[in-house]
A protein has these predicted regions:
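Histidine-acidic metal/acid-base catalytic patches
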Residues: 1-4, 9, 13-27, 100, ...
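Active-site beta-loop-alpha junctions enriched in small/polar residues
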Residues: 6-10, 34-38, 66-69, 109-111, ...
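Active-site acidic/histidine proton-transfer and metal-coordination neighborhood
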Residues: 14-17, 55-56, 74-176
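Residue-level detector of anion-binding/catalytic polar loops
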Residues: 29-30, 60, 102, 144, ...
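Conserved beta-strand positions in the central sheet of alpha/beta enzyme cores
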Residues: 32, 63, 105, 146, ...
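Glycine-rich, proline-tolerant flexible connector loops at the mouths of alpha/beta enzymes
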Residues: 32-55, 111-115
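Surface-exposed, active-site-proximal loop segments in enzymatic domains
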Residues: 41-45, 68-87, 109-123, 218-226, ...
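Catalytic-core regions built around general acid/base machinery
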Residues: 46-58, 130-137, 195-198, 237-241
């Protein structure tokens, strides 16, 4: 497996330009670029400059993060490119195909009320419909879609089994998974990752690795993520399960922790690398 850095870790204290330099220095193999930080880059730089960086450095781009689906999206045969989600998708495809990034993270619909109370089967069917359309739009760009289950109660796709049903129903070779250790844990404190063994292994396009604080259910959220090595997520079991499945791809550290955002980007990226590398080495997952 290869080490990767997701820009969410230093979102509020860094820039894409800084992240590129610091990730190269730290030793990361890949970087996951955030769309908001990509737009920040494009204010003063060009896509060709980003392409040139990756052509002349060891660090390479992986998935672009992220496009958020919503119920009723893409109602017509042709996409509405004024739709903010489709603008994100188009930017990810345009830039990704230019710089050598072949993946975009896709997040299922999240209920703005905080709790999904709809019909689960209908919601899964809607995800299948949207993903099928996005797969067609992505194909000319050579992009693959990494569908990410979210274990929070506001999500309509909370489990590995649900995500697997959707990806199998889509049945497109450019639609697969990104498995995120904390998003799996968020579904009823799940530290049993054995369901990953039941998915099509070739469909695991990306992996996100992190742990999280031990807090009451009412306080659980993405801001409680922390680097591997402490916390309540059994990251060892997660990595060992992926290894059993034959996964050898990238493992990207992704946190949304305000405490980290108050640090320097140097501190964040150095610690992100050391903890991720240590976790992979401990579980004999390094290539």
């Amino acid at each position: 497996m290869k080490t990767s850095y997701n820009e969410a870790c230093s979102r509020d204290c860094s820039t894409l330009e800084q992240d590129l330099s610091l990730c190269e220095k730290a030793g990361f193999d890949y970087i996951e670029i955030r769309l908001d930080m990509l737009r920040g880059w494009l204010k003063d730089h060009t896509v060709d400059q980003l392409k040139e960086f990756f052509e002349t450095h060891r660090l390479k781009p992986h998935a672009i993060n992220a496009v958020y689906l919503r119920q009723g999206m893409l109602p017509d045969e042709m996409p509405d490119w004024n739709d903010p989600a489709m603008q994100d998708f188009k930017l990810a495809c345009d830039v990704g195909s230019t710089i050598g990034s072949s993946y975009v993270i896709i997040v299922p619909p999240l209920d703005p009320s905080g709790v999904f109370t709809g019909d689960t089967a209908a919601a899964e069917k809607e995800c299948v419909r949207i993903l099928k359309k996005l797969a067609v739009f992505a194909r000319p760009f050579g992009m693959k879609l990494c569908f990410e289950l979210v274990g929070l109660r506001k999500s309509c796709v909370r489990s590995i089994e649900a995500a697997d049903r959707i990806v199998r129903a889509v049945d497109e070779d450019n639609v697969g998974f990104v498995f995120d250790s904390y998003n799996i844990y968020l579904n009823d404190h799940c530290n049993d990752f054995s369901a990953i063994k039941t998915v099509q292994p070739e469909k695991i396009f990306a992996v996100h690795l992190m742990s999280a604080d031990d807090v009451p259910d009412s306080e659980m959220g993405q801001d409680k993520r922390c680097f591997s090595g402490s916390g309540v997520v059994d990251t060892d079991r997660f990595l060992k399960t992926l290894k059993i499945c034959g996964y050898t791809g990238m493992v990207s550290v992704e946190t949304f922790r305000p405490e980290y955002w108050s640090k320097t980007p140097e501190w964040v990226i150095e610690n992100a690398y050391s903890t991720t590398y240590t976790a992979l080495k401990k579980n004999q997952c390094l290539e």
